[in-house]
């Protein structure tokens, strides 16, 4: 009587599932370790500002409208709020830009006049105009997804650049370059 031997699977066939599983685990781990970008760039870059006319958010400055950007000079539009910690951190940098001749307009998001007045008194007021966007309608229309965000607007009212997050001191030269590009 012969002992029928069952056919053996090749040795690699035993290790293949384990190898594939380990490769999967490594790829998933690397994907989880990579920081996710939560930045949502505006689709409005290269487009004219949407029409808006915001009331004054502060007694110290006039409101803000689309027509204010058709001056022939590039401007920085800063989306901020008194309740935003990074906005307070950004304030000295905006003041530095204003001292260097940059015209800065602000849109205060979901803010209250007394809170905003206190914020500006504490952190300085680099803004030529501040519009009150109490329901974030203009913020969303220009493609902003959070605060702070800044946009370089050319002298015709076209959005040329979006900066997501607070502007840091080391980014000032880049912002100045973007403003200069927008003025050409």
Regions found by a protein language model. Give the residues of each.
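Thiol/disulfide oxidoreductase modules built on the thioredoxin-like
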Residues: 121-126, 133-184
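N-terminal targeting signals for export/organelle localization
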Residues: 1-55, 184
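Structural microenvironment flanking redox-active thiols in thiol-disulfide oxidoreductases
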Residues: 88-124, 134-140
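Hydrophobic beta-strand anchors of alpha/beta hydrolase catalytic cores
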Residues: 76-77, 104, 150
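Hydrophobic alpha-helical transmembrane segments of integral membrane proteins
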Residues: 10-14, 88-89, 144
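A short beta-strand-turn-helix
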Residues: 52-76
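Aromatic-flanked redox-active Cys/Sec active sites in thiol-based oxidoreductases
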Residues: 78-83
